[in-house]
């Protein structure tokens, strides 16, 4: 995978004061990917050292009063060309910088105060559709024994649990909030495994319960709350779906957004929630752009076809009618299923980083679709899904 990274984060002395800002998590990522080092400020020809620069009223000023907007724009376009000419889809830039800041930058008073805004290079990269994050994102998603990655698996995908080098197993009946009388459906197992996959700490849940079985939204999302309680900050959902013809085709995909059509919401059951600060959760970028970009990069490297699109969560358990499929198509939906939607809402309420992978096992509403045929289709893509998940975990 190709990644552009701010040179200062890799330890190069290119900052205005002649120093660097090396970040261990970024350096570890750089060891696993094909890196293009960028620094728009030095690319512009600005000297090192120099006075600090900040944006103010749409211009970039040095602390000595010099207007260096044109220099920053020139350097940003040089860096942009280095990124686009190499077909790079991910850039890791220095937070708060007037050239590389993402969502917030210094306000131009040189007092350390931050305001909403983007660096000059960041704006250009975003316009090109490139995923831009700062070192804070890389540090936040880095797994550890204290912060393992959670994987919640759906029909026919529980085989991923076999990859785990186990340390401990947890019966679902011992998980707070999970229905003790529940029995796993075919293709599911109700025993979580704590351990590692290729050395990466994980907690794998190879089965779940659903609303259509009569369980509440709180019970359906109890595994997410349990993962959060165990310290998980990153969570990967993998489940079988139907592909909405015209918007998606069968095979592996990554979910970019969702529509909750289940008729309920776990945050509406406020009295039973643990660890959630507010039910009024921002669902913009509910599916981490960074994790999605990693998944696409891994898929490209491994030559795995990986589509993407919007997911619609329905109540089920019946498969979709032709009229429902037509409606979903008009909504811009690519994938439809009976899980994931509520779990993603809960994960975001708990401030977890979400990646949702899907196996579109059948065309939505197709004649002859059965639970068994979905399981059989899952087996067809089992190897590619395994390679994809292992590849993503390896980059965290």
Positions of predicted regions on the chain:
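Divalent-metal-activated hydrolytic enzyme cores
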Residues: 43, 53-78, 82, 113-141, ...
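Mid-sequence, gly/pro-rich, charge-dense loop/helix-turn segments that line enzyme active sites
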Residues: 99-100, 107-124, 128, 190-200, ...
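Short, surface-exposed acidic-centric catalytic microdomains
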Residues: 21-62
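Metabolite-binding pocket within alpha/beta catalytic cores that recognizes anionic/polar moieties
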Residues: 58, 139-283
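Short catalytic helix/loop segments, enriched in acidic residues and glycine
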Residues: 19-36, 118-122, 165-186
């Amino acid at each position: 995978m190709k990644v552009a990274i701010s040179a200062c984060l890799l330890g190069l002395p290119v900052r205005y004061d002649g120093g660097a800002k090396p970040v261990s998590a970024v350096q570890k990522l750089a060891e696993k990917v094909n890196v293009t080092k960028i620094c728009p400020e030095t690319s512009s020809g600005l000297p090192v050292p120099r006075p600090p620069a900040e944006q103010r009223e749409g211009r970039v000023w040095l602390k000595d009063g010099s207007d260096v907007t044109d220099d920053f724009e020139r350097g940003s376009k040089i860096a942009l060309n280095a990124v686009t000419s190499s077909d790079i889809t991910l850039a890791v830039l220095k937070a708060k910088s007037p050239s590389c800041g993402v969502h917030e930058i210094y306000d131009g008073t040189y007092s350390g105060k931050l305001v909403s805004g983007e660096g000059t290079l960041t704006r250009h990269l975003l316009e090109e559709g490139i995923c831009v994050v700062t070192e804070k994102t890389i540090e936040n998603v880095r797994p550890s024994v204290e912060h393992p990655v959670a994987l919640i698996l759906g029909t026919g995908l529980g085989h991923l649990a076999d990859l785990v080098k186990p340390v401990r197993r947890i019966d679902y009946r011992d998980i707070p909030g999970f229905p003790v009388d529940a029995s796993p459906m075919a293709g599911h197992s109700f025993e979580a495994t704590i351990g590692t996959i290729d050395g990466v700490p994980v907690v794998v849940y190879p089965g779940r319960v659903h609303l259509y079985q009569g369980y509440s939204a709180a019970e359906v999302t109890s595994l997410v709350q349990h993962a959060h309680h165990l310290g998980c900050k990153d969570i990967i959902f993998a489940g079988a779906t139907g592909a909405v013809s015209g918007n998606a085709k069968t095979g592996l995909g990554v979910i970019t957004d969702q529509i909750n059509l289940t008729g309920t919401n776990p945050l509406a059951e406020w009295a039973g929630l643990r660890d959630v600060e507010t039910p009024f959760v921002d669902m913009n970028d509910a599916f981490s752009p960074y994790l999605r970009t990693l998944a696409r990069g891994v898929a490209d490297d491994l030559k795995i076809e990986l589509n993407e699109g919007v997911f619609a969560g329905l109540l089920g358990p019946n498969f979709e009618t032709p009229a429902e499929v037509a409606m979903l198509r008009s909504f811009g939906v690519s994938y439809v299923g009976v899980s994931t939607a509520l779990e993603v809402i809960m994960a975001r309420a708990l401030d977890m980083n979400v990646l949702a992978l899907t196996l579109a096992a059948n065309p939505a509403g197709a004649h002859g679709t059965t639970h068994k045929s979905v399981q059989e289709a899952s087996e067809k893509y089992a190897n590619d899904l395994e390679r994809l998940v292992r590849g993503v975990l390896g980059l965290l």
